[in-house]
Amino acid sequence: MATWFQGPADDFIRVSREGFERGVRILHFLGGSSVDVAGKRALSQTKMTITQRADVEGVECDVVCTGRFVDFLERRDRWGIVLRQPIYESDRIIPVDPASPPQLDRGLLESFPEGYRHLAYLQTRNGFTVKPDMPGLKGPEVEALYASGRKWLLGENLDR
C-alpha cells in the first residue's frame, strides 16, 4: 500500500512505470531494520525516507517523508513479502529555490494526516487520489497494524 496506490504488486509496478514515463520522480531510501521471526513467518520494520519532486502551486518542491515499512513475511519455497504497510511519521515540503516558497491552501493541507500531509498535498495537487487513513505515529490505524503483526507471528491470517 502507498498513499496514492492500493492494489496488487503487479499493478503497482505498472502504474509506477507509467508515472516515470510521464516524469513522476519518487525516490525511496531505506535505513536500519529489525526482524521478528516465528517459524515460517516474520515481521520486519525498516526505516525509510520517501522523496518526491514536483510542482506545488507553481513552485518546484521536494517533499521528504520519513517513516517505516512494516513487512509481513512468510517462508514458502523462499522468504517473501506478503504485505508491506508504511507508517508515515513526519514530512516536510522544501522549495527547490528557498527564495520562492509555495503558497499552500491551509485548509487542504490540514485535511490530511499529520505524518504525510505535505506528501498528500503534493500528490493531490498533481492528480493522485490519496488514501486518507494510513498509519502514523499514533492512532487507531497504527494500533491495528501492530495488532495485525502480533497475530501474524502467532499464525493467524491477515485481515485485508
Predicted regions and their residues:
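Compositionally biased, intrinsically disordered low-complexity regions
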Residues: 9, 21, 33, 69, ...
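Terminal "cap-and-tail" regions of soluble proteins that handle hydrophobic small molecules
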Residues: 76, 80-160
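Exposed boundary/loop context
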Residues: 24-25, 60, 108, 120
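A solvent-exposed, acidic/Ser-Thr-rich amphipathic alpha-helical stretch
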Residues: 1-52
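Exposed beta-sheet edge and beta->alpha loop/turn motif
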Residues: 42-77, 90-110
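Extracellular structured ligand-interaction cores
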Residues: 30-32, 66-70, 83
